[in-house]
């Protein structure tokens, strides 16, 4: 298989760096950083920790959107905070609701300083009978060029800040009424799980992703357990161990091939970090056990990686790793060179892997009709034409 021009590059370079606005948001700051910002506006050292805890509670427990809501903070302090800061999160530009209940939000990030353009990202809420999962983005665009992924065709504009990542969770909670003492207008369904599987490669934005997930998992705030947060990477090997040590969330690997020559084409990052290095990093992942298995994501591509020989090789590769295998039917998008494997072939592949002792669920495609399924996200900064959108919807309806 000859690599396409689009996938020839292993990584893309960001077109921009983030420039903070003149009045920055406090969303995404650690407690220590909040104390520093309070010091910047004249709060005395003995009061900073207490004030920071008040802000933390209002932002992450009650979802305050304005300092005026913070009724146990003095009027003078609220005025000072409002003069210098905001608690803004991204703006909802559009909301789409799939026939299966999946929701996709197009979010406009606050524009930065020096006239920096406001950019857009997407996040997706997936309701299920026993959980509600939010798929969160880490970059505007993506560093990588995975051949089967729509997001990978987009430019990498810039990394998101910790505040912009946390802000996606807060927007979803706003829309779902998922804050304490709030009405729940959308069926009383709560966000119980977070997956870092939206736009971008999280481990190429490690510091911001780490800081955001530590806030999201803080039990005095949003409080989503680290065991209910999954970070998916295409294999940035040097940061895999750091993920376990510094964040402690569940790990997922976008594997998709069992031979280096094929993975070089599907996931060009493999040329930098080949399978042997990637799988060793998984064996060494801190905290991995039968109770905390690593998920290996495997998109099923017709005639490419879906043979029983591929299944046998997959089982061999994962020997010694506490693992489960998530088989993903390929989600079509206009211009893609791939097709989804036939369902009977997916079932045979799954059965072989299951009989070898690995959990191998087939992911149910969700939100295809609104371009919200795995591999379909692409922000409005890289708009689809009407023809492309109609073509994609037609493909979704024929599955």
Curated annotation (Swiss-Prot):
CDD domains listed in its UniProt record: Radical_SAM (cd01335)
Protein location: Cytoplasm
PROSITE patterns: RADICAL_SAM
The keyword Iron-sulfur is annotated on this UniProt entry: yes
Catalysed reaction equations from the record: adenosine(2503) in 23S rRNA + 2 reduced [2Fe-2S]-[ferredoxin] + 2 S-adenosyl-L-methionine = 2-methyladenosine(2503) in 23S rRNA + 5'-deoxyadenosine + L-methionine + 2 oxidized [2Fe-2S]-[ferredoxin] + S-adenosyl-L-homocysteine; adenosine(37) in tRNA + 2 reduced [2Fe-2S]-[ferredoxin] + 2 S-adenosyl-L-methionine = 2-methyladenosine(37) in tRNA + 5'-deoxyadenosine + L-methionine + 2 oxidized [2Fe-2S]-[ferredoxin] + S-adenosyl-L-homocysteine
Residues involved in [4Fe-4S] cluster binding: 142, 146, 149
Catalytic residues (UniProt): 122 (proton acceptor), 374 (s-methylcysteine intermediate)
GO biological process, one term: rRNA base methylation
A GO CC annotation given for this chain: cytoplasm
SMART domains named among the record's database cross-references: Elp3 (SM00729)
Gene Ontology molecular function terms on file: 4 iron, 4 sulfur cluster binding; metal ion binding; rRNA (adenine(2503)-C2-)-methyltransferase activity; rRNA binding; tRNA (adenine(37)-C2)-methyltransferase activity; tRNA binding
Record's cofactor remark: Binds 1 [4Fe-4S] cluster. The cluster is coordinated with 3 cysteines and an exchangeable S-adenosyl-L-methionine.
Ligand binding (S-adenosyl-L-methionine): 200-201, 232, 254-256, 331
Domain Radical SAM core: 128-371
Family to which the UniProt record says this protein belongs: Belongs to the radical SAM superfamily. RlmN family.
Other notes: Reaction proceeds by a ping-pong mechanism involving intermediate methylation of a conserved cysteine residue.
HAMAP family documented for this protein: RNA_methyltr_RlmN
Name this protein carries in UniProt: Dual-specificity RNA methyltransferase RlmN
Gene encoding the protein: rlmN
